[in-house]
Amino acid sequence: AYTTEQCRALNGTCRFYACFPKNVVIGKCDWLG
């Protein structure tokens, strides 16, 4: 799973336990951010 920091490093946001960089789900996040 991606951490919130890893997701943000990819210019993504954590929603619904998934990382969404540019609106593409690439992996689960560790928590709802």
From Swiss-Prot:
GO terms for molecular function: toxin activity. It is found in: Secreted. Its main location: secreted. Expressed by the venom gland. Pfam families: Defensin_beta. The keyword Secreted applies. Signal peptide: none annotated. Belongs to the beta-defensin family. Helofensin subfamily. Lethal toxin which possesses an inhibitory effect on direct electrical stimulation of the isolated hemi-diaphragm. Neither hemorrhagic nor hemolytic activities are detected. Phospholipase A2 activity, proteolytic activity and arginine esterolytic activity are absent. This is Helofensin-1.
